[in-house]
Amino acid sequence: MVLAQRQKEELNRAIADYLFANGYVKALNAFREESQLAGENDRKYDGLLEKKWTSVIRLQKKVMDLEAKLNEAEKEFQSMQNAIGFGVAGAAPGSGLSDRSDRRDVDAIPRPPAKFTLTGHRSPITRVLFHPHYNVFVSASEDASIKVWDYETGEFEHTLKGHTDSVQDVAFDPSGKFLASCSADMQVKLWDFTIYQCIKTLTGHDHNVSSVAFLPSGDFLVSASRDKTIKMWEVSTGYCTKTFIGHTEWIRSVRPSPEGNLLASCSNDHTIRIWSVESRECQVVLRGHEHVVECIAWASHPQNLNSLPSSMNSSLLLVSGSRDRTIRFWDVNIGICLFVLIGHDNWVRQLVFHPHGRLLLSASDDKTIRVWDLKNRRCHKTLNAHSHFVTSLDVNRLAPYAITGSVDQTIHIWDCR
């Protein structure tokens, strides 16, 4: 394979950085002369060769694993054909083939014991989040760092340093190229995740920044703060383009709607507000919680919630968790609470919908995660997840894994089955 001139230049500089970092001075001087490298290396080449090398090894392992799974799937497919006399594509309605597949998806929830327990942070974990495309996830902590991990092997990959106080939240853009983080240092940082480098620092909040999220387009991100405001930032320039004002206390979380035209925010003032992105006006105030509202999440598949009246299947549905220990389900269009889920014995800290939308997972200070059956509006399973408060939870959309983070400074990776 022939490399383009720019690729050759990047490879040569990565090699030069490797030689310099390892003290191979004679080899470095000879290499610079032979390759005609001029000037000093940019910081973006720091450790680049090692990163590429480990990435290649990880991808090779991934390819081998996928090939093995493909072989197993082909064998299973062949055995099914032999057993029933026709292919899966020809399965008749009610034959049970698709039903079994659906049941496997429904049952794919975290099961004990934890596959891996990861340590490395020196303070409580504040957020865990899967990458939208790669087999890695990130963890944020009160130790002011963000760490990158391989969820299939449990191996540590990298540490992102730059914040000077507790990192409160992280978010990936839809492409997975950019990571946003926010901190008690009053800053929002934008990282190029492909090279693990901070490319922008966004300033403007006057207090702890507690939440950050990208709009679905990826062109803008929003942040919420203890200064009682929400700010919208243009990713390409880093400029603040809008400020949303209305909450009377610390805003704990902000989340854009699936279409990106609305924002939902929750606060210490016990309310949830729905905002128009275009006009910046608050359209609805949702009241009902009796304590701080810690977390919110939009239902991305309301049509799958067949416990609701059919007239509501196209509604905008939002779920919220509070220090009052309850989870509330809201119809945003008409501003009413549809039902309340009760079961946790302490603050509800994080809410995540299962990929198919019919289950909800919650993390709590009662040290558990709960799986809720939304059709029957009851707790389907309780998992004793950590030895201390469970602060964060995420479910992978592409692979059968879940992750949790805790005040006990550990991260657990769970198999979903």
From Swiss-Prot:
SMART domains: LisH, WD40
Source taxon at top rank: Eukaryota
Single GO MF annotation: dynein complex binding
Location(s), subcellular: Cytoplasm, Cytoskeleton; Cytoplasm, Cytoskeleton, Microtubule organizing center, Centrosome
Repeat region (WD), residues: 120-159, 162-203, 204-243, 246-285, 288-340, 343-382, 385-417
Keywords (A to Z) from UniProt: Cell cycle, Cell division, Coiled coil, Cytoplasm, Cytoskeleton, Microtubule, Mitosis, Repeat, Transport, WD repeat
UniProt family annotation: Belongs to the WD repeat LIS1/nudF family.
Name assigned to this protein: Lissencephaly-1 homolog
Organism annotation: Schistosoma mansoni (Blood fluke)
